[in-house]
Regions:
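ADP-ribose/NAD+-binding catalytic cleft of ART/PARP-like enzymes
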Residues: 1-49, 62, 67-74, 81-92
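Active-site-proximal loop/hinge segments that shape catalytic or ion-binding/gating pockets
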Residues: 87, 92-113
């Protein structure tokens, strides 16, 4: 089993629309937060992220959400939940992305602060 983290918002991934480049306060790093819309996370795919793993729809993979992005997203209403994912659920594994099958996830309900 692999532990990953899902980014959630009441409006689904549509809430990410308009978030383009978010710069780190130091100015050293930026994260591109683009997704193909309108593809909500409840369409059979989960959109998972942690410091090195981010899930996106198979037609267009998403980008990395490093730890410093999370407080910025929380201010905009996002929250994060941990999931346990079996290896057979992995459809694609990239350097910063992973695509998994929703029905094979086990939600632990551990929301991060």
């Amino acid at each position: 089993m692999m532990q990953v983290i899902r980014c959630e918002h009441p409006e689904g991934l549509r809430a990410l629309h308009g978030l383009a480049e978010i710069e780190h306060p130091s100015g050293d790093t930026a994260a591109s937060l683009w997704y193909d819309l309108p593809t909500p996370y409840h369409d059979g795919w989960y959109y998972i992220l942690d410091e090195e793993v981010c899930a996106a729809p198979p037609e267009r993979l998403g980008t990395w959400f490093p730890e410093w992005v999370r407080p910025l997203l929380r201010k905009q209403g996002f929250r994060f939940v941990t999931l346990e994912v079996p290896e057979q659920a992995l459809c694609h594994v990239g350097k910063y992305q992973v695509v998994i099958k929703r029905e094979l996830c086990v939600e632990r309900g551990e929301y991060l602060q």
